[in-house]
Amino acid sequence: MTEIITKANTNQYQTGAAAILLACILWGTTGTAASFTQAVSPLATGAFAMGVGGLLQALLAGKIIAYQRRQLWQFRSALLCSALALAVYPLAFYTSMQLAGVAVGTVVSIASAPFFTVLIERLFGKGLSISRRWWQSFATGALGIALLAGAKTPMHAQSGSDYLFGIALGLVAGLAYAIYSWVAKAMIVQGVKSQAAVGAIFALGALLLLPSLALTGENLFANPLNSSIALYMAVFPMCVGYLLFGYGLRHVEVHNANLLTLFEPVVASLLAVWIVGETISLLGWLGIALIGGCLVMQSQQKGAE
């Protein structure tokens, strides 16, 4: 009986991990897609994509949100905090990519999230122990990320101050992402359906983000290219991607989930090479291989540590 339960937990973990990796593929397309917009502020790109994507998620989860409204009300403070973090995330993330480059902005934002997640769990969690295997896989992934970031050639040369500010914004994005995912996981663990938790957070985040388009949304729909990119990013990476991530959080601990998201900068870098025309050196490819090893280690873990 114990073996059956263990096998079931492992299968659930691997299904959740696969959903998170699929979400990473969708998220990894955002930097390349955004690079083709014409005269559009990164603030507008982030606000529209996350805002409209959030509204779509809320509509899809409307019945579940209504059914669990009392449970959600019990988490109102956490919901507000998570929604604020979710609103900050795309603004910091897309601006970071513009200032530091698509690859470096993505790498810093995503690679810092596992660090911040563990810190949050240590400060506010229930003493969840972090396994030696997690630290080993994180060290492998962090080394891979460092090699990839150092070997990548940005699309546009930036001044030193802009570059450093872009990296700082990437760290802000990583912290915001960690807060969102930790709150969502905490709600799911305490009985809130993943669709209700994610849908409610995104609905509140959308209410904070969409009004900013009145100030930043110039040229967002100035031509068919800008319009199609904006709609693609809202529907697929932001809506479908976060639905997949929410599903994955049912079966994967949040510190493991955020470590799996290191797959996103790999996807982003490969797309930048194949589509945008950037180059990756031998060290960069070695970094990608190390990140792959990190992902294999994480995807084979049991559902509970």
PLM regions with names:
Residues 60-64, 113-136, 266-286:
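C-terminal transmembrane-helix exit sites in multi-pass transporters
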Residues 1-53, 84, 88-92, 156-186:
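Glycine-/small-residue-enriched transmembrane alpha-helix faces in small-molecule transporters
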Residues 32-40, 98, 149-163, 213-230, ...:
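Membrane-interface helix termini and inter-helical loops of multi-pass transporters
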Residues 14-19, 44-60, 135-143, 165-172, ...:
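Hydrophobic alpha-helical transmembrane segments of multi-pass integral membrane proteins
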Residues 48, 105-112, 183-206, 238-274:
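Helix-helix packing/entry segments at the starts of transmembrane helices
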Residues 62-105, 109, 146-147, 234-252:
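Specific transmembrane alpha-helical segments of multi-pass solute transporters/efflux pumps
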Residues 57, 131-152, 271, 283-302:
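Hydrophobic transmembrane alpha-helices of multi-pass small-molecule transport proteins
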Residues 37, 45, 96, 123-126, ...:
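Hydrophobic/aromatic residues within transmembrane alpha-helices
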